[in-house]
Structure formats: structure tokens, C-alpha cells
Regions:
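Non-catalytic structural scaffold of enzyme domains
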Residues: 1, 16, 26-328
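Extreme N-terminal basic, low-complexity initiation segments
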Residues: 5-10
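Glycine-biased, low-complexity coil/linker segments
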Residues: 21-22
Length: 328
């Protein structure tokens, strides 16, 4: 199908669709597209890496920006919101669903893998890639990720694999919200002022929002900074190439890169090492709204990405400005 030849009426209907779940045209054109979910703009860095590795694929990006960030919400609310989005995305019959949100993966990734007949892959802090050379590592995460069993188990496994590395998790209660509100356009100090002042050998970004201020964090600490976007995109590419579309596919990086795991491991109960660092100031929790009220569609200029959710227009604009031009 030539998108340019068929988009005149389609785009108009899609953008202004009043129907929850999108128009019939949208569902037909993007049926079988790879689906990504994030609470807001964070997962756009993952979308960009996926587009780089899979240029012929179509994608759907669902952003629940009106309730972002998720990191300060209770796990029950997070799982409810993610489940709402996943149910809508399942209607597009995706070959895979990517949770481009560390908080969503930590809180409900495993339950979604048990529910759906397609692979569900999730973003995890890249502690296994970062810990290979040892040293003291700062792991920046949201409050919900910090308190999850999944994250504790991940740290425990990383410490067992790399005993020369020490991981210090740090809950950033306001950083994702600052990035969401400013679209990473503020001076470095705005994002780094509340971070720990200690020196570290490496920093791991445990929230996809943080990737948008990666350079600011690198300048602050003067050490390598790791995020999981590329590793997650690689896992998706391998999953699709291998035809792993059966129910129960765990989406773990261990399945594909047992020696060079760049994006986390299977989760189970456990405990990670903690340091008594001062957390960022907690911000207020966004008011809840029905996601079905924000289901009209917006499509990227090249016709490859359908944006859904309350932040569809914001995410499309930020994606086009920050990433899409680099794909041409």
C-alpha cells in the first residue's frame, strides 16, 4: 500500500476520530504493527531505536501523558492504566508489545506476559552491561521501580554476576516529571540539581524518560552512562526474526544475549544493595482520566508510526522534532 497515495482522507479521519480505539481505517492500516507503550515521552527513545533496526516495520506508540509520570503512583494504579492501554493495543493484533517504560515492566510486565498470546518485552535497567568492568554504579530509577520486587531481583542477579561492581539505586521522584513537562529543553542544572553528589564509575538510567537528558547526566558525573533503548530494540528484532510470537514468550534479554545482556533479566523475588542517599522531592500525583477519551489517532509524517493515547499529538511532535529527521 502506498501511504502517500491513500493518506488524503485517511489522515483527516484518523486525527479527528471521535471513536475509542481509533477509526476502522486506522485499525486496518496498522493491523499487525509492533506496539509500544510508555507513560509519556520517555519511550520515544526506544521507538527511535526500533525504527532504526526495523525500518520496514509499522509501529503504534501509546502514550498516557495525561497521567505521566507513573513513578509516584501506587502499583495497583500503574497496572490498571497499563492494562487499559494493552487491551486497546491488543485490538491491532501486534506481533509484539514493547513496554518502553521501566516502571510498567517492573510493576506488571510478568502479568501481561501471562495474559496475552504475543510476546511482551519490557525495559529494564542495563545493570548487566554496566557492571562488567566493576566499580561503583549509580542506578537512577522511579520510586515505583525502586520499591518493586522485580528491581530488587535484578540488582541481586547483577551483584552475583559481577561481584566487583557495587550498585547504588536512587529513586528520583521528580526527574521524569521535569522531563515530561519541559521536553528536555531546560538547562542541565534543572535536571541534575537533586541527584547525588558522590562520584561514580558509571550511571545506569532506569527510566526511559531519563534518556532524554542523558548528556546532562553524563556531564554531571563525567563517567559512562547506560540506558536500555538499544538493547530493548535488539531484543525486539531478534524476537520478530525468530518468529517468537507464541503465548508466554517472556521477552527477557537472557533469552537472546546470555553473555552480553544489555537490558535486564527475568524477574523474581530478591533484594538489591541500597545506599542511604537523599531522594528527590516527591511531586503531586496527576489526576486520573479515562484513556478511552483520548483515542483519536495521529500519524507520523512518513506514515510508519501511529500515535495513540492522551499524549498522541505531543508525542508525535516531539518524535518528529527530535528523532524522525535522523531516520531519513
Amino acid at each position: 500500500m502506498n501511504f502517500a497515495e491513500n493518506s488524503e482522507n485517511f489522515c483527516d479521519k484518523a486525527v479527528f476520530s471521535p471513536f475509542p480505539g481509533g477509526t476502522r481505517e486506522g485499525k486496518k492500516f496498522f493491523s499487525g504493527a509492533v506496539c509500544l507503550f510508555d507513560s509519556g515521552v520517555g519511550g520515544l527513545s526506544v521507538l527511535f531505536k526500533c525504527r532504526e533496526m526495523l525500518p520496514s516495520r509499522k509501529f503504534i506508540y501509546y502514550g498516557d501523558n495525561v497521567r505521566a509520570p507513573y513513578g509516584n503512583l501506587p502499583p495497583e494504579a500503574i497496572c490498571r492504566y497499563v492494562s487499559e492501554a494493552a487491551e486497546e493495543l491488543a485490538g491491532y493484533f501486534p506481533p509484539a508489545l514493547v513496554l518502553a517504560c521501566n516502571t510498567a515492566e517492573a510493576c506488571c510486565g510478568e502479568s501481561l506476559r501471562k495474559k496475552y498470546p504475543f510476546p511482551v518485552l519490557g525495559a529494564c535497567p542495563s545493570v548487566l552491561a554496566a557492571g562488567k568492568n566493576g566499580g561503583d554504579g549509580l542506578v537512577l530509577v522511579t520510586r515505583a521501580t525502586y520499591e518493586s520486587r522485580a528491581f530488587a531481583s535484578l540488582l541481586r542477579q547483577a551483584e552475583m554476576r559481577f561481584p566487583a561492581a557495587r550498585f547504588y539505586p536512587y529513586p528520583c521522584d521528580s526527574l521524569a516529571g521535569k522531563i515530561e513537562d519541559t521536553l528536555a529543553s531546560a538547562p542541565d542544572e534543572f535536571y541534575t540539581a537533586e541527584l547525588p553528589t558522590q562520584k561514580f564509575s558509571f550511571v545506569v538510567l532506569g527510566c526511559t524518560h531519563y534518556a532524554h537528558v542523558r548528556e546532562a547526566i553524563a556531564r554531571r558525573y563525567g563517567c559512562p552512562v547506560y540506558d536500555g533503548a538499544e538493547g530493548l530494540a535488539r531484543r525486539l528484532a531478534v524476537t520478530l526474526a525468530a518468529g517468537k510470537t507464541e503465548a508466554g514468550s517472556r521477552g527477557s534479554a537472557e533469552d537472546f544475549f546470555p553473555e552480553e545482556n544489555e537490558n535486564g533479566v527475568d524477574f523474581s523475588a530478591g533484594k538489591g544493595k541500597e545506599q542511604n542517599l537523599r531522594p528527590c522531592v516527591t511531586t503531586s500525583v496527576p489526576a486520573t482520566q479515562n484513556s478511552a477519551d483520548f483515542s483519536a489517532e495521529t500519524i507520523s509524517s512518513d506514515g510508519k508510526v501511529l500515535f495513540l493515547g492522551s499524549g498522541r499529538e505531543k508525542n508525535r511532535t516531539f518524535y518528529e522534532h527530535s528523532f524522525a529527521r535522523n531516520l531519513s
